[in-house]
């Protein structure tokens, strides 16, 4: 496929050259934007496109006369039909670069697979999503939000990191850190509940991750044991950022009804504007579940559970310390304006007496020995994954990336619902 534009007319003037040079300088300063976005800018710049070398790079063709005998001429080609950049803008990330070994998770839109990079021999968790399923449920904004949030999380030890994202004609791929210590949900199911020191350790690491997200004006909105992983040493790793809301400042609110029923805050159920304190409510619900084995207002009947969340007083059994009781009462405060964290956000949680034994600097640097070690022998140790997933065959279509459908580097993204999805980290040797 090629870009169709007007043939170069007249000599390349100084002003035209300046236009092309300006684009190149901008690219060098903003390499994180990705090659496909850069190519799109060049393709849209009339001065640059008239330069012979640029035409050669883009494979720009000269305009052709329409077929005289065609009574029903085709409409002008869309951007998806105009530029061919080859198989990938990022040679380090396309489906055929990976051996897909096992299914390790499933969701509404696709699967998570253990994969080994053929060249690097590194192991990754690759989240593969079906575009049709996403578009059918009109969830493309959430997928792009997840991608955007992942790009901001790479420097925090308790948030899963994104290495690459790319797409084919029918699928989206997130190449993520491979975490194989199991979901917190999995361990809670096996042990029913945790002793208070273990619950405190996990709650502290979770709070640290949430506080970091809040510092970026991101509200997580979907904290639950299924989204909390343990790494091979036993530290928590927060994953699945599809429901995150960006650009929520300290006093900012949003109103989208979303989350998981057991962990919804009262203001969300009331369909009132809510703020980042919804995350502290969820932290309280998860801590309660770690200590007692079930979420605080749980009922098999969803309507009854919602009524409990809205109206039932919090009931705490006597087998926890006073500091744990006080923390749960503060986090599970139904009035968000009185909830722990409403004034000073993470600092209120950090300074609570329940966490007085936590050295937060040591925590963030992973100098505190986790209370539980998953004892995994290596990347191929899948003991902490549900056999329901790992025994499922890997779909053969997952690893296919024929050049005819791979669009990672194509400016076809400009005409698609997933504009800018593809990502590769900057490389010093790129230019």
Curated annotation (Swiss-Prot):
Free-text activity regulation comment from the record: Two specific sites, one in the kinase domain (Thr-256) and the other in the C-terminal regulatory region (Ser-422), need to be phosphorylated for its full activation. Phosphorylation at Ser-397 and Ser-401 are also essential for its activity. Activated by WNK1, WNK2, WNK3 and WNK4; which promote phosphorylation by mTORC2.
Motif (Nuclear localization signal): 131-141
Binding site for ATP: 104-112, 127
Domain (AGC-kinase C-terminal): residue spans on this chain: 356-431
Polar residues bias: start-end ranges: 81-91
Positions bearing Phosphothreonine: 256, 369
GO BP terms, alphabetized: apoptotic process
Active-site residues, as the UniProt record annotates them: 222
Positions bearing Phosphoserine: 74, 78, 397, 401, 422
Alphabetical list of Pfam families matching this protein: Pkinase, Pkinase_C
Catalytic activity: L-seryl-[protein] + ATP = O-phospho-L-seryl-[protein] + ADP + H(+); L-threonyl-[protein] + ATP = O-phospho-L-threonyl-[protein] + ADP + H(+)
Region of interest (Disordered), ranges: 66-92
Gene Ontology molecular function: ATP binding; protein serine kinase activity; protein serine/threonine kinase activity
Enzyme class at the top of the EC tree: transferase
Record-annotated membrane-spanning stretches: none
Principal localisation: cytoplasm
Subunit-structure text: Homodimer; disulfide-linked. Forms a trimeric complex with FBXW7 and NOTCH1. Interacts with MAPK3/ERK1, MAPK1/ERK2, MAP2K1/MEK1, MAP2K2/MEK2, NEDD4, NEDD4L, MAPT/TAU, MAPK7, CREB1, SLC9A3R2/NHERF2 and KCNJ1/ROMK1. Associates with the mammalian target of rapamycin complex 2 (mTORC2) via an interaction with MAPKAP1/SIN1.
UniProt record similarity statement: Belongs to the protein kinase superfamily. AGC Ser/Thr protein kinase family.
Name of the protein in its database record: Serine/threonine-protein kinase Sgk1
Organism for this UniProt entry: Oryctolagus cuniculus (Rabbit)
């Amino acid at each position: 496929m090629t870009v169709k534009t007007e043939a170069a007319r007249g000599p390349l003037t100084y002003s035209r050259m300046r236009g092309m040079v300006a684009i190149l300088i901008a690219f060098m300063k903003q390499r994180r934007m990705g090659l496909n976005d850069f190519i799109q800018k060049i393709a849209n710049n009339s001065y640059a496109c008239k330069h012979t070398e640029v035409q050669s790079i883009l494979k720009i063709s000269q305009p052709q006369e329409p077929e005289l005998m065609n009574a029903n001429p085709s409409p002008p080609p869309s951007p998806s039909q105009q530029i061919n950049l080859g198989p990938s803008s990022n040679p380090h990330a396309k489906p055929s670069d990976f051996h897909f070994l096992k299914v390790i998770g499933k969701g509404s839109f696709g699967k998570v697979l253990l994969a080994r990079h053929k060249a690097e021999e590194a192991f990754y968790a690759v989240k593969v999503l079906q575009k049709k399923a996403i578009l059918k449920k009109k969830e493309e904004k959430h997928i792009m939000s997840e991608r955007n949030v992942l790009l901001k999380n790479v420097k925090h030890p308790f948030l899963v990191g994104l290495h690459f994202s790319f797409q084919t004609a029918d699928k989206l791929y997130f190449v993520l850190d491979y975490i194989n210590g199991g979901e917190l949900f999995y361990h809670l199911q096996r042990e029913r509940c945790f002793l208070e020191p273990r619950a405190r350790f996990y709650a502290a690491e979770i709070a640290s991750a949430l506080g970091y997200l809040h510092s970026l004006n991101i509200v997580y909105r979907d904290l639950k044991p299924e989204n909390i992983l343990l790494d091979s040493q036993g530290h928590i790793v927060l994953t699945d950022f599809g429901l995150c809301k960006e650009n929520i400042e300290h006093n900012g609110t949003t109103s989208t009804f979303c989350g998981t029923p057991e962990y919804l805050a009262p203001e969300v159920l009331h369909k009132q504007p809510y703020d980042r304190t919804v995350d502290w409510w969820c932290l309280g619900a998860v801590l309660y579940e770690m200590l007692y084995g079930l979420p605080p207002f749980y009922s098999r009947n969803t309507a009854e559970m919602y009524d409990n969340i809205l109206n039932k007083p919090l009931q705490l059994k006597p087998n926890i310390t006073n500091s744990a009781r006080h923390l749960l009462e503060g986090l599970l405060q139904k009035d968000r304006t009185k909830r722990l964290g409403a004034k000073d956000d993470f600092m209120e949680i950090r300074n609570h007496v329940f966490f007085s034994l936590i050295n937060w600097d040591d925590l963030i640097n992973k100098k505190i020995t986790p209370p539980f070690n998953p004892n995994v022998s290596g990347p191929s140790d899948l003991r902490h994954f549900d056999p329901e997933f790992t025994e499922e065959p890997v779909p053969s279509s997952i690893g296919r990336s024929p050049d005819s459908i791979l669009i990672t580097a194509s400016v076809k993204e400009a005409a698609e619902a997933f504009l800018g999805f593809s990502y590769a980290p900057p490389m010093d040797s790129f230019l």
